Amino acid sequence: MATAYKVLAQQATTASLVSMYTVPASTETIISSIVVANTSASDRTYRITVQPNNATLAQKHYIAYDVTSKANTTTAYTLGITLDATDQVYILGSTTDLSISLFGSEIS
């Protein structure tokens, strides 16, 4: 099995929940870090979900819910989230002023 350490995804938020990352077929992923950067001079909020196997969104899938990101700040989460093929990470922000990055490894 090969392990690729990489930037998994980088995306600006929108006011709608959007898919940020989907684990490729025949692959497992470990998200080691999530970084949220607020590029606005105002506070913003965000949500992050992890949905296994194309599951319909439920309360249990949120790993962050309406978290406030202070103006012009960056928050880094060091994690060890394990994902299976087709699992997805979704994001939502109060505006487009938030940038979210996922870092980790894909094992295939």
What are these regions (language model features)?
Residues 44, 61-65, 98:
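Short beta-strand segments
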Residues 44-55:
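The feature marks short-to-medium sequence segments in extracytoplasmic or secretory-pathway proteins
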